Amino acid sequence: MEKLARQQIQALTPYLSARRIGGSGDVWLNANESPFNNEYKTDFARLNRYSDCQPKAMIQAYANYAGVQPEQVLTSRGADEGIELLIRAFCEPNQDAILFCPPTYGMYAISAETFGVERKKVPLTTDWQLDLPSIEANLDRVKLVFVCSPNNPTGNLVKRADIIKLLEMTQDRAIVVMDEAYIDFCPEASTVDLLAQYPNLAILRTLSKAFALAGLRCGFTLANAELINVLLKVIAPYPVPVPVAEIAVQALSPAGLARAKYQVLDLGANRAYLQVGLSMVPGVQVFEGWGNYLLVKFPDGDALFKAAWEHGIILRNSPIENCVRISVGNREECEKTVAFIRNYYQ
């Protein structure tokens, strides 16, 4: 059967999500999930009917939260589908290209590869910021420029001034896609206010992280109405299951937003605990993080990762040499992780 697949698919190395990698243990800090398990009510009496393509109450609720108009919002099956929609809608296969800046989220490249779209890599600088001169030199045939802030896996914020420069240099040439999956942990750093000025800006959001709804698979794309209308041409007819829409509206209600805000504060305290605790271990470097995870450099990253795995503490290995990404869990999980790493280096 494999020989019948498209050539790009035969050669494709799939994205290794945390669940695909697997593992067994009682401390799971490998997928940037929330440790909170919130309860919701759903009405299963309407499951015989299809959902709306873009449920109005859900779109209005997220528009209110994000500070935009409903016509500037599109919901999809996670932000990953938003990535695919943008590539399908704006990139001609075997002609156009996307540009991304590693180390960063791996699905930009994989999604482009599955659609036969060229991937241009412009690595981040040594302090993990945009290399604007190199980006400008590589914009030929580029339709989409993906920027993740806070960046995954490094955790840092991309400089706002550089984002504006990027938007300026790509006007009438390409769309800048800001991946703000983790922006709810630092909302002051959002670029949503730039939508009014830059029609070539699109923003990816999700309920997976700060809203503790990774299993819901609910994402959003924010952009000007003209761009959203293009995406509506290629999205599936019924992309949002009825229970997903109902739960999303509850999560975005005043009570849901208050709970999310409290949980973000709780995770911020645990992140600080992890950062301080690991920084005290000789030879360990903890990079400043703005999401619900930290990138940590160890003297022997691969060995530490394997030792933690065997101890039932499941972390996320990183493409950056000797670096491991650690999600921020509840306090007990953070304490167990810090204690294990301290003992490992004694």
From Swiss-Prot:
EC number: 2.6.1.9
UniProt keyword annotation of Amino-acid biosynthesis present: yes
Matching SUPFAM superfamilies: PLP-dependent transferases
A matching Pfam family: Aminotran_1_2
Catalytic reaction(s) noted: L-histidinol phosphate + 2-oxoglutarate = 3-(imidazol-4-yl)-2-oxopropyl phosphate + L-glutamate
Pathway: Amino-acid biosynthesis; L-histidine biosynthesis; L-histidine from 5-phospho-alpha-D-ribose 1-diphosphate: step 7/9
Molecular functions per Gene Ontology: histidinol-phosphate transaminase activity; pyridoxal phosphate binding
Any single biological process term in GO: L-histidine biosynthetic process
Cofactor(s) recorded in Swiss-Prot or TrEMBL: pyridoxal 5'-phosphate
N6-(pyridoxal phosphate)lysine PTM sites in chain numbering: 209
Record-linked InterPro entries: Aminotrans_II_pyridoxalP_BS (IPR001917), Aminotransferase_I/II_large (IPR004839), HisP_aminotrans (IPR005861), PyrdxlP-dep_Trfase (IPR015424), PyrdxlP-dep_Trfase_major (IPR015421), PyrdxlP-dep_Trfase_small (IPR015422)
Keywords: Amino-acid biosynthesis, Aminotransferase, Histidine biosynthesis, Pyridoxal phosphate, Transferase
UniProt superkingdom: Bacteria
Recorded family membership: Belongs to the class-II pyridoxal-phosphate-dependent aminotransferase family. Histidinol-phosphate aminotransferase subfamily.
HAMAP family: HisC_aminotrans_2 (MF_01023)
Oligomeric and partner information: Homodimer.
Protein name: Histidinol-phosphate aminotransferase
Organism: Vibrio cholerae serotype O1 (strain ATCC 39541 / Classical Ogawa 395 / O395)
